[in-house]
Regions:
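Catalytic phosphate-handling regions of large nucleic-acid enzymes and associated NTPases
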Residues: 1-132, 192
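C-terminal interaction appendages of subunits in large macromolecular complexes
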Residues: 77-80, 84-352
């Protein structure tokens, strides 16, 4: 549900709750989800995924997904364990990309939290997300008129319900004088605070920040699992490691793609020679007494061309040539075959 509410990795349909009001999502049978195009592109690649056997040994499951962007920093995380706790605040996706580019260029960068619920933030003591740091988050309060205040954005970690409760409690304690509070939140937060006659709106705003959840303090603690051990890092270090990991994944994907291209080039070259030289029509091939004799004949006919192939010709290569159907041979076009080989060579050159 949290991933769906972020609108980054999951395309959601139905009632997925509301992060502003704290309303929970509908039952699973009433909601639908699918991976976004972005998620399919940056989260999944079976060729670079590390797999392990499932608990019953019948299927394989991923040890981890080959994520090619700093998901931990974009999504944020919070948890507690024996003697440990973690509170990693979410960050703006665009700012993460910009910081990653600066890191790749060897330039200095700074990262600060960004909250989906809005509000303003004081990051002077953020301490790069490490222990001992703190950030102050404020709601956005506007004056509708002299007697009415409107809260348009709520602090991170709070909902309109908890915010209203804190305002009512402050009113009961005499910290602020209000007549009533109305929650008109829909797609965006909108809480109307009606002041009692004679109450200064400026003083009321100061009181809301001082005595209610309109201003909160958050203590980040960037604790991650590194090589199966807990480690305290800064968010900048997490980004650097994520970028290095992404670069290694991209290099691995390119090498896999290059290997596939070289295999395709090798067989395309074999196929072209096999068809152009009409090896399939050789009498010795057609009258071969067994499979070994047929393979041996094709191998000997390919001998003069082996220096131009991309690797050694194996028995499996020859067996694959023998499986080419006559329809494919009849439709063979030399120009198209050469164009295909040229395109694959160009792509290999770009990878190199």
């Amino acid at each position: 549900v949290q991933l769906g509410q972020k609108n980054l990795l999951i395309d959601s349909q139905g009632n997925w709750g509301n992060i502003l009001t704290g309303d929970s999502a509908a039952a699973p049978r009433y909601i639908e989800a699918r991976l976004s195009k972005f998620a399919l592109d940056v989260l999944f690649n079976p060729k670079t995924t590390e797999w392990k056997m499932s608990y019953d040994g019948r299927k394989k499951e991923p040890v981890s997904l080959p994520v090619k962007f700093p998901l931990l920093l974009a999504q944020g995380a919070e948890g507690i364990a024996v003697g440990l706790s973690a509170k990693i605040l979410p960050h703006n996706f665009g700012e993460l990309c910009e910081a990653a580019i600066k890191y790749l260029h060897g330039e200095e960068f700074h990262l600060y939290p960004d909250f989906q619920t809005g509000g303003s933030i004081d990051v002077s003591r953020y301490n790069d997300g490490m222990r001992g740091g703190a950030v102050k988050v404020r709601a956005k309060i506007e004056k509708l008129d002299n007697k009415t205040l409107v809260i348009r954005e709520v602090p991170y970690g709070k909902t309109t319900s908890t915010l209203i409760d804190s305002i009512l409690k402050a009113n009961e304690k005499g910290k602020i004088k209000i007549r009533k509070v109305e929650d008109n939140t829909a797609a965006e937060a909108e809480i109307h605070v009606h002041l009692t006659p004679g109450t200064s709106s400026d003083k009321a705003i100061d009181a809301l920040y001082a005595f209610t959840d309109c201003e909160t303090s958050i203590n980040p603690n960037c604790c991650v699992i590194d090589e199966k051990k807990p480690k305290f890092l800064s968010v900048s270090d997490v980004l650097r490691r994520s970028v290095d990991h992404t670069r290694s994944l991209l290099e691995k994907e390119l090498m896999i793609r290059r290997g596939e291209l070289m295999e395709s080039l090798h067989f395309a070259s074999l196929e072209r020679i096999f068809i152009e030289e009409r090896i399939y029509k050789d009498r010795a091939f057609e009258q071969a007494k067994d499979m070994d004799a047929a393979v041996s004949h094709i191998d000997s006919r390919l001998e003069p061309y082996k220096p131009q192939f991309y690797r050694e010709v194996t028995r499996d290569d020859i067996l694959r040539l023998m499986e080419i159907k006559m329809g494919r041979i009849l439709k063979f076009n030399k120009e198209k075959a050469n164009e295909l080989i040229a395109r694959m060579k160009e792509e290999v050159a770009r990878i190199d």
